[in-house]
Amino acid sequence: MRKPTFSIGGVHPHDSKISRECRVEPMPLPDSAYIAVAQHIGAPAKPIVAVGDKVKVGQPIAEPGGFVSAFIHASVSGTVKSIAPRADLAGNPVMTIEIAREGDEWMEGIDLSDTLVTEIPDDNKAILDKIRLGGIVGLGGATFPTHVKLSPPPGSKCERLIINGCECEPYLTSDFRCLLEKGEQVVIGAAILKQVLGGVPCTVAIEENKPEAIAHIGEVIARLRKQSPKFDGIEVMVMKMRYPQGGEKQLIDAVMHRQVGSGALPISVGAVVQNVGTALAVYDAVLKNKPLVDNTLTVTGECFPHQANLLVRVGTPLRAILEHLGGIPDEAVKVISGGPMMGKAVANLDAATLKGTSALLLLTEKQTARGEEGPCIRCGKCAEACPMGLEPFLLQKLSRIGDVEALEANAAQDCIECGCCLYSCPANIPLLDIIRLGKADAMKAIRERAAAAKAAAEAAK
């Protein structure tokens, strides 16, 4: 039987899941946590603490800066040492709250026990409030505030919840370990999300290269169904191994056979997609009163002798993580935050983890070497590989000459930055790097036009 997958494009990089057998281990607490106020899509959070304040783990330290924004909490207990710009992994200044750790004292009311809670409250408004107050964001890469995603605009209706367990990015295994080690919590979190969305059907999508997770989640669902009807309507769907199967729009295409239009949101076709890590965080927030103060990330690479999946407090310096695992080996010449397809090079190892940090990948000179760039030979391989149906060879040309109007007309803003074009190019053209710049220009033009239209409408009132 053919396994479902998306309809256009895609590539088949080696999965390189060399850390898949590494159980999640807690990372030792950092001496200081550096917690950025901009670590989600939307407006940065606004600090609500001052230098010298004493804080506990789980205490709110920054509040949402707008409708699309999220609470941020102290990930360690101690004293607020500074609130100032600090370099992120690219070296850019980001407003950051520094907390010097003193012990590990948590806010009252947070349940840190291993006791599994299966009873889901009926009050959806209270559930949404806990998700909002817990600072829960999407942990599949986009870090979109979850409470906003669960509140569709008027006229929109969710028809299916998709829990994304594909983890198609090579090397990453934190979601796989989450499914194996916290499968019950993930399914309960999915049931909570399902209830908030009106009891819609729920599909847990897992790629075929994770048979242990597929079997385990199936068993968990069957067991929980016997306890409560709230777990009815949740199913596992085994997906074809293909990159980027875990892309939001690609997953909707594969599961629901619906295409999200240019500039549209998944809810426009009746879909809401949440990552397995987000489902786990929702369980913690709603049933354990635990805000999002830590996340699991993979540390890996063929040149790295100490493969690991670590539970890391938000704001832990990247350098501390690597030193905990023995330091950077001599043959490693580059550290990537994320995977090899969509990740970004780390220019500053003193940068700290964010809520959405998924991996640290160490690469050798041979792995990072790019062939000499040649001229485009018009082979069309990049267009064949693009899962969004774009023409990367054209977009890179328009980006080079700075034609923003043409970039927008050719849907540069729809690029999901998956890297399939770069992976497929025989001329070694850095398509993704160039298109990213053009996409940023197109998005800026779209935002400026929307702001101008809004201002004109306000003035006309």
Give the residues covered by each predicted segment:
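Acidic low-complexity segments
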Residues: 87-144, 155, 211
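Conserved hydrophobic positions within beta-strands
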Residues: 78-80
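Gly-rich Lys/Arg/Thr-decorated short loops/hinges at beta-loop-alpha junctions or inter-strand turns
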Residues: 107, 138, 161-175, 303
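N-terminal, Lys/Arg-enriched amphipathic/low-complexity engagement segments
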Residues: 1-48, 98
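Histidine-anchored nucleotide/phosphate-binding helix
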Residues: 180-196
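Short, well-structured beta-strand-loop connectors
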Residues: 50-63, 82
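Hydrophobic alpha-helical positions that pack around
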Residues: 199-318, 324-331, 339
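Ferredoxin-type iron-sulfur electron-transfer modules in oxidoreductases and energy-metabolism complexes
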Residues: 357-373, 383, 387-461
